[in-house]
């Protein structure tokens, strides 16, 4: 399948590359429709990451937060046109003690492994979640960062005492704002 990838080749320079994407029946092909730019993407683009990191990871398609529509699923679990969220972490092993996002063998999109700035993204079936039709796609593009906030709040719940009349969140970015919204909703 012919695919177009938009790769950052050096700070502030994105080049278009065309390649033949192998189509595996175990994968779902997703066409990204709404993407969210993370601070990590900005640091790669602006060249504010360490030069050694840039040299090691570029060229690379950016963006690890996004939703899209299914273009192809040979197994039929998803229909063409189904709205889905793409999970950027790709684990290759299971560990009873270490969460998949902390395993050294896992690959994370847009961190040394092409992200979602492509016309089509081949995703493992377990890395795709169908979205309800009622969810606004612009909001859904933030599901990955919302999951980060939710994970932090779940840990907070496990290790904090029961008195939660007042909770403070330090930070002035999207993650702090979303975490504050979720905390307010939960408590």
Feature-to-residue mapping (PLM):
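Extreme N-terminal starter segment of soluble prokaryotic enzymes
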Residues: 1-4
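Residue-level recognition of beta-strand termini and adjacent short loop/turns
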Residues: 9-10, 24
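Glycine-rich beta-strand-centered segment in the early N-terminal region that forms part
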Residues: 23-35, 50-93, 132-134
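Cysteine-cluster motifs in flexible loop/terminal segments that predominantly coordinate metals
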Residues: 38, 88-129
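Glycine/charged-rich beta-loop-alpha catalytic/anionic-binding loops adjacent to active sites
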Residues: 127-137
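Mid-domain Rossmann-like dinucleotide-binding core that forms the NAD(H)/NADP(H) cofactor-binding site
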Residues: 135-187
């Amino acid at each position: 399948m012919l695919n177009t990838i938009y790769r950052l080749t050096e700070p502030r320079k994105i080049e278009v590359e065309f390649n033949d994407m192998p189509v595996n029946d175990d994968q779902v092909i997703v066409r990204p429709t709404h993407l969210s730019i993370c601070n990590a993407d900005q640091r790669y683009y602006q060249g504010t990451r360490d030069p050694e990191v840039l040299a090691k990871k570029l060229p690379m398609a950016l963006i690890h937060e996004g939703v899209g529509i299914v273009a192809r699923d040979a197994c039929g679990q998803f229909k063409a046109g189904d709205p889905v969220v793409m999970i950027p972490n790709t684990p290759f092993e299971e560990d009873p003690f270490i969460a998949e996002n902390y395993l050294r063998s896992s690959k994370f999109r847009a961190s040394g492994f092409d992200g979602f700035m492509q016309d089509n993204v081949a995703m493992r079936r377990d890395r795709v979640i169908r979205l309800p039709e009622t969810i606004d796609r612009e909001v859904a593009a933030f599901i990955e960062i919302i999951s980060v906030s939710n994970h932090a709040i779940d840990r907070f719940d496990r290790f904090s005492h029961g008195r939660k009349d007042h909770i403070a969140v330090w930070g002035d970015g999207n993650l702090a704002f979303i975490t504050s919204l979720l905390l307010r909703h939960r408590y």
